[in-house]
Design a protein with these regions (language model features):
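NTP/phosphate- and nucleic-acid-binding module
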Residues: 1-428
Length: 428
């Protein structure tokens, strides 16, 4: 991408929100646009980063046999009444946006258990069709009374939600474990330390649930994590009258070994049992031709929260002043930003074309109205992990490639530059 095409707004880092600095940088750049509280439009950088996260999720789910589908965002009231959740979501919890016209009454999907159960029952009439896992990635809507934290708690957001179908409780638990492993692989590839945490089932229902929490000072949750066993629990568990028995069931024997973290929830998994299949009267035929309810699970990952967490957790400071952020190389939508002095435009454009031809996404800062110093500063507000400056120090033989997070500079022979980014550039 040529930076002149982005029409990036000029910003002053001293004016940035001190609490949600990374997301506020994008807001002031114009890469996030707030239509009203909790409702955003997304620029090129955010969309590209979202696609990267999406592709990682798709790869990890597909390799485990999950099938990508798509359900409607506009869902009829009648299917939510089948599961007895319409009043729960529109009156008791007041979570769902609804609309009513001459065609009927509808809700904008905050989740899709009803659609998934109907869809699955139509395709999975027999035990021979099981197990199956369907997933989608798309926009969801929730009536957050107090939207806050930019993309940490908005009213519209992009989510991966998956739904599994099994013939028995035992098989459901195996699928649940399979999805747990998929989640851990996804978060590892994103460079996020995740703490699986025992969860409340809430309005989703079911018997067992867990959250996937990431440590961040901006989080709203406080968990206690057992590093040895890899088990997290909510802080309020310590106030339970039967806490020792509860912790023992989880395998936690030494409370003093638990470490406290402020976290944000990036994903959750639920063992639903037969809740939806039974309430919606949707069954499969077992080996004896008898109608049996599906044992289901549901699974969610918030893509917007992941991106917000990645940006906020990778902020850069210089002399205690905010400098910007640097995304991990493996997920950055643009791997390197090329800056040049006027007399070196041809060399910079040649390098840019060379990288693009080898599918190494680069930003060429071709703006004419800014000095080289200001253009270098802008590398950090775009989160680009590598930077090449072509100017008077350029010897025509080597490129100086700077890691924007560490400041380490590699001298790379011109003939080796593609190989560097394909192999060595990922070592951050």
């Amino acid at each position: 991408m040529k930076l002149s095409q982005l029409n990036m707004k000029k910003i002053n880092l001293e004016d940035i929100d001190s609490h949600y600095s990374g997301q506020d940088i994008l807001l002031k750049l114009g890469e996030l646009y707030q239509f009203e509280s909790g409702i955003y439009g997304y620029g090129n950088l955010w969309v590209k980063l979202e696609r990267t996260v999406e592709n990682i999720i798709i790869e990890e789910l597909d390799k485990r046999g999950c099938i990508q589908v798509e359900f409607p965002k506009l869902q009829p009231k009648k299917i939510w009444e089948q599961s007895n959740r319409w009043d729960m979501y529109t009156k008791e919890g007041d979570i769902m946006f609804t609309l009513k016209n001459n065609l009927g009454e509808y809700g904008l999907a905050p989740t899709a258990e009803e659609c998934a159960t109907l869809f699955g029952a139509n395709r999975l009439p027999s035990y021979k069709n099981l197990p199956a896992i369907y997933y989608q990635i798309g926009e969801k809507f929730r009536k957050e009374i107090r939207a806050r934290g930019y993309l940490f708690r908005p009213r519209t957001f992009v989510m991966m939600d998956a739904y599994s179908f099994d013939k028995s409780e035992e098989d459901m638990k195996k699928t649940y474990q399979l999805m747990h492993e998929a989640y851990m692989a996804i978060f590892a590839r994103l460079g996020l330390k995740i703490m699986p945490t025992v969860s409340d089932n809430g309005v989703i229902g079911g018997s067992v649930a867990e959250e996937f929490q990431a440590a961040t000072p901006l989080g709203e949750d406080e968990i206690l994590f057992d590093e040895e066993n890899g088990i997290g629990i909510n802080r309020e568990v310590l106030d339970f009258p039967n806490r020792d028995d509860y912790l023992k069931q989880l395998g936690v024997t030494h409370v003093e070994a638990l470490k406290s973290y402020t976290t944000v929830e990036l994903g959750n998994n639920f063992q639903l049992g037969t809740k939806y299949s039974t309430s919606m009267k949707l069954f499969f035929k077992d080996e004896d031709g008898v109608d049996k309810p599906y044992y289901m699970g549901c699974y969610g990952i918030g893509l917007g929260r992941i991106i917000a967490c990645l940006i906020e957790n990778n902020l850069l400071y210089e002399n205690d002043k905010l400098k910007g952020f640097a995304l991990p190389y493996s997920i950055a939508p643009y791997k390197v930003q090329i800056i040049y002095q006027t007399d070196y435009q041809l060399q910079a454009e040649k390098l840019y074309q060379q990288l693009e031809e080898h599918h190494i996404s680069a930003i060429l800062d071709d703006r004419k109205d800014l000095g080289i110093g200001n253009r270098i500063k802008d590398v950090y507000v775009l989160g680009t992990p590598k930077m090449i400056v072509i100017g008077k120090k350029f010897d025509g033989i080597h490129y100086s490639v700077e890691d924007t997070k560490t400041g380490i500079v590699d001298s790379v022979n011109i003939s080796d530059i593609v190989d560097y980014f394909e192999k060595n550039g990922k070592n951050r």
